[in-house]
């Protein structure tokens, strides 16, 4: 992936991993467009930096995605990198509720949103030099946390979708998967200070080191996520599920 001189669109750029990736890629000499639901959070990410731009987008709104894609291509015709980072995580008790609102919202934001935005931008990206799509999945794509079943399922689906996308766009668009471990962000209440989670700056430091490798790995995996990513291969899957469920 070309990590300098690119025009990069990052969804979920108002906080957490999206915010830090946007700032780091901007520091490397890229033009970065961040998208998210709240302009004030996006402006906090920019913080007066040059070559950073903000556009409001709710990835759960199909019509908004289509309009957004047309607008961003018109405003930034050099766009060559898409990072699908936006997402939500909700706890669900499958034995006590029959209201699927959280599940449906999670599927829309975490799975349909990235698929729709990728679909809306693929024709443009194929026409650009050094084009790349980065899909953010999760270590929970490979070993589920029992308390967040739909989140796990959407991230497993994003992993599979990314593999298929890589094959279909081979030679035209570079397809990369970023699978974080548990990181101290605002994804869930209290998570930004939760003991045992990877500090956000440490995660970003290690992640950017991997992005800067040439060639860029098809999967960006910090060391800490390896336990989950390779649990099934290494015969530790059941043990890993039990360990996550106990926490």
Where are these regions (language model features)?
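The beta1-alpha1 cofactor-binding region of Rossmann-like NAD(H)/NADP(H)-dependent oxidoreductases
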Residues: 56-70, 100
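Residue(s) in the substrate-gating loop at a strand-loop-helix junction
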Residues: 138
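C-terminal helical subdomain
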Residues: 177-178, 189-235
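Conserved glycine-rich Rossmann-like NAD(P)H-binding loop of the short-chain dehydrogenase/reductase
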Residues: 28-44
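Active-site helix of classical SDR
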Residues: 118, 154
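Conserved mid-core segment of classical short-chain dehydrogenase/reductases
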Residues: 66, 89-104, 147-150
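Conserved glycine-rich cofactor-binding loop
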Residues: 12-16
